């Protein structure tokens, strides 16, 4: 009876039978052929969910409720289906309650199986979320729990991940002669892969910098390089660290196609001298009471993608009342609901205005980004590192 009352239909390949978001009440049983089930995601792309062949079925939810379709269903090859809509189901029930009861029972069985699969997916998602949370805590442990506190200086960090884990990172380490290593990096992409690479990057930079700097100090103490100045040691440490890091990544991890932008520096607190390397990173800005003084442009390419490249070392002296602000492109590229970016010009305009502290500057930029993005999902990690030399009265 079902075969005679239901509509039998034949479709060519490429015909859209169910449209995601449409409200329809037709249940399909595949007699011959195959269909593809897919779901629309961001930017007009589709994610393939399943391919159903003869004996498969779809659209059962639409037969019993009035909710939109959850996916698109398109014929993969010429396909023959039975189509059962709400009116057909009602006629079957009226003509033969037994067949109607059996059909309803089968549809309910399908729904029950879907509920079981959904519950299983929920449990798997919860397990994955727990693993991500563990990863977040481990990643958090790679970041310094507190920024260094130095007489006459203020060092502030801010990291706001776009997801559970982040591809951005920062670091600050005080050497035993009071000079300070400062690092800000941005790994390409987002998510777990970027987070793993972030951990590797941070570990390499810290380990190589500490090794090279302490090697210079031992040489000075042993009189092997008596003429070598502290400034030369700072510059050489930066250059050797980035060369070793880039070499290690390109030799051992080139197949990952992962790389990072990297700004890192060593600060000499007594004089305000800063030696730095900028590996393809957004140029940090030096700003003071009279606005922006300069930007610290790239001294070499991205790190981890091109072997055997060279990096120059830049230098600058921070005067009292000046702040050096480094930030990732998540700041300039923060987007609102209409996909309009916050923009570099807006950041520069904020930096022209003086602030009483590095913390106030970072908070003012953060507040401006929040006002711009409002309820839009965060598109990228947002990270800032601010170093301010206090005026004599504030030391």
Task: Give the residues covered by each predicted segment.
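Short beta-strand segments in beta-sandwich/barrel cores
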Residues: 7, 16, 34-39, 57, ...
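… and, occasionally, acidic/histidine-rich disordered N-termini of signaling adaptors
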Residues: 22, 120-325, 374-395
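Ligand-binding loop in jelly-roll beta-barrel domains
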Residues: 64-87, 98
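A cytosolic small-molecule/anion-sensing beta-strand core signal
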Residues: 12-13, 31-32, 53, 77, ...
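Regulatory nucleotide-sensing modules
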Residues: 1-45, 164
């Amino acid at each position: 009876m079902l075969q005679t009352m239901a509509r039998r239909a034949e479709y060519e390949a490429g015909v859209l039978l169910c449209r995601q978001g449409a409200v329809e009440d037709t249940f399909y049983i595949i007699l011959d052929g195959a269909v593809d089930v897919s779901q629309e995601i961001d930017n007009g792309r589709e994610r393939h969910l399943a391919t159903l062949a003869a004996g498969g079925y779809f659209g059962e939810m639409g037969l019993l409720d009035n909710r939109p379709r959850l996916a698109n269903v398109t014929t993969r090859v010429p396909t023959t289906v039975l189509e059962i809509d709400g009116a057909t189901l009602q006629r079957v029930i009226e003509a033969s309650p037994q067949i109607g009861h059996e059909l309803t029972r089968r549809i309910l069985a399908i729904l029950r199986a879907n509920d079981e699969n959904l519950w299983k997916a929920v449990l798997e998602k919860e397990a994955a979320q727990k693993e991500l949370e563990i990863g977040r805590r481990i990643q958090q442990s790679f970041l310094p729990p507190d920024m260094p506190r130095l007489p006459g200086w203020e060092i502030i960090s801010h990291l706001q991940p776009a997801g559970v884990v982040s591809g951005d990172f920062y670091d600050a380490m005080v050497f035993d002669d009071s000079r300070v290593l400062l690092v800000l990096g941005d790994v390409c992409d987002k998510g777990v892969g970027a987070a793993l690479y972030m951990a590797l990057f941070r570990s390499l930079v810290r380990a190589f910098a500490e090794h090279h700097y302490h090697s210079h100090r031992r040489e000075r103490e042993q009189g092997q390089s008596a003429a070598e100045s502290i400034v030369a040691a700072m510059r050489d440490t930066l250059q050797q660290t980035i060369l070793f890091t880039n070499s290690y990544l390109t030799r051992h991890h080139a197949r990952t196609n992962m790389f990072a932008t990297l700004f890192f520096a060593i600060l000499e607190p007594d004089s305000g001298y800063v030696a730095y390397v900028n590996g393809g990173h957004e140029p940090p800005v030096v700003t003071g009471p009279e606005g922006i003084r300069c930007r610290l442009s790239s001294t070499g390419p991205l790190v981890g993608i091109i072997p055997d490249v060279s990096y120059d070392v830049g230098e600058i002296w921070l005067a009292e009342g000046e702040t050096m602000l480094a930030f990732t492109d998540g700041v300039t590229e923060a987007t609102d609901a209409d996909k309009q970016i916050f923009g570099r010009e807006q950041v520069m305009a904020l930096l022209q205005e003086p602030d009483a502290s590095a913390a106030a500057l970072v908070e003012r930029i953060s507040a401006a980004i929040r006002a711009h993005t409002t309820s839009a999902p965060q598109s990228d990690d947002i990270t800032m590192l601010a170093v301010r030399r206090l005026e004599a009265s504030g030391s």
